């Protein structure tokens, strides 16, 4: 496979990075977690802006009002979202935008905030429940649409990621079947790749943060980046990030053109390597920052916590590794 980005893809990534850094910079990110009246709340104005840039309609056909691109381009966009810790059910709303009818239109345009949960794993942990306009449930029968206002649950008092409020739910209304089993399976694959792309963005940003700190922090009369142990940590972070990048890009290309490889193997590998890079880089970045890395004021812990949350979505490490082993 050729992973060299086309000029259009480079322009897309550059434009999305400029938008993300301009509309959700560090000051806004910290304000959301430090001073927001409701921690982890979905900013509806920002959600609409994301929709206007094509975050949710990227893969919707042009004749249906979308951008008409593929999973490869979506992965580039979601990698950038991961770099700045954009909050909210981004992947779920992106997937919902492909549905026919009003829900798909509302998701694509940013009118609706849509959640997604795998109905085979109990008890359910539903993210952003209070902010949702619709909840989609992946089941053995396909995809069911549930009214989130009819869902009863217990909010988790201190969620791992302060940007991601979670509600524990023991049962769900039956809802309405809106898509078949094949669509549900395809959503699982695309969702895993886009979540892997978010993890790739997190891993890359953590590498940048650690190396920048290592260049600036002085100890014993020299910058700590000159010490071999710190060099090795930063180098290992970069290697993990680039391995994850290759895996995520390969999976995205494979979903766009299954003839180039085995989609199941590619998707599982992308999610495994993305999760591994993000979570391990979070731990190594904390170590590079020393005692400062454990403080609330340094952003490393926010990236690590988000990585832990993503690592539970679309299959955890053990589940995905067993599934990958079964294909060999």
Where is each model-derived feature located?
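Alpha-helical interface subdomain recognition
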Residues: 1-84, 187-328
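FAD-binding core of flavoproteins
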Residues: 85-94, 98-208, 212
